[in-house]
Design a protein with these regions (language model features):
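Mid-domain alpha/beta scaffold segments of enzyme catalytic cores
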Residues: 1-266
Length: 266
């Protein structure tokens, strides 16, 4: 069995002392590939460094909505240049986050549209971030949709209406450890049967959102723990683990246009 953590931040400084061990832990948990996701120019550079060093790691470049207050065309030009690296497989994460407004809404919307255009020009799938945008995110991607684009709505925790909107746009749905949480994950669990199996990918969003089975043991999430989310998904869907793992793997490499031979299974 092989699992793919479709969204992690092991480029975060909290892994600087034990990153190699974290990647070893992932392999022991059958997590044989991971997408290291950027949120800033600096984190994009680190993601590419990690992808260069570890064959099972891939990278994205992009600016998170929290960080667009410092975005500029110069920053995006640098990211565009880096996007041509062979291990860069996606643009993101980008989107809208109105939860705590670390960047003004006007700036978020401006740089979101700009990054959509860049990803389209580069023909890269998009890793979307949406939180508490009250319908504005869907409104924007529906109005700016020049072509069918590949993308994933990472860490989905929205309502059924939003889920339908994303599926109608042919986006994949990223499922995190929220699925395992007793109260917080209750509504998400109720929506799982509405997501076609070919549209699901799993993720940790580490170091955040530690799944329930690990939450009382460790503070920091890591790619190995995507296995807990996977097993909960198997339980909800009543799927055989080998069967579901194979489908989720295919979904993820299709999304990021990764060839099987690009992933070294050790």
């Amino acid at each position: 069995m092989k699992l793919f953590d479709s969204h992690c931040h092991i480029n975060d400084k909290s892994y600087d002392r034990d990153r190699k061990a974290v990647i070893e832990n992932a392999k022991k948990a059958d997590v044989h590939a991971m997408m290291v996701v950027a949120i800033t120019e600096q984190s994009a550079n680190k993601a590419i460094e990690i992808a260069n060093e570890y064959s099972q790691c891939f990278a994205s470049v992009g600016i998170h909505p929290h960080d667009v207050k410092t975005c500029s065309e110069n920053v995006l030009s640098t990211l565009i240049e880096w996007s041509h690296h062979p291990k860069v497989k996606a643009w993101g994460e980008t989107g809208l986050d109105f939860n705590r407004m670390f960047s003004p809404q006007k700036s978020q919307e401006k740089w979101f549209i700009r990054q959509l255009k860049i990803a389209e020009d580069l023909n890269l799938p998009i890793i979307f971030h949406e939180r508490d945008s009250k319908g504005r995110f869907l409104e924007m991607i529906r109005s700016y949709d020049p072509n069918e684009r590949k993308g994933v709505v990472h860490c989905f925790s929205g309502i059924k209406k939003e889920l339908k909107g994303y599926l109608d746009l042919n986006y994949d749905i990223g499922i995190t450890g929220i699925l395992t949480m007793h109260k917080r994950g209750e509504y998400l669990r109720s929506l799982i049967d509405y997501i076609p199996i070919e549209r699901i990918v799993i993720e940790t969003d580490s170091p955040y959102l530690t799944p329930a089975p690990e939450k009382n043991k460790v503070r920091r999430n890591e790619p190995a723990f995507v296995r807990s989310t996977f097993l909960k998904l198997c339980d909800i869907r009543e799927d055989d683990p080998e069967y579901l793992a194979a489908i989720l793997w295919k979904n993820t490499i299709r999304l990021f246009e990764i060839l099987e031979e690009e992933v070294t299974i050790i």
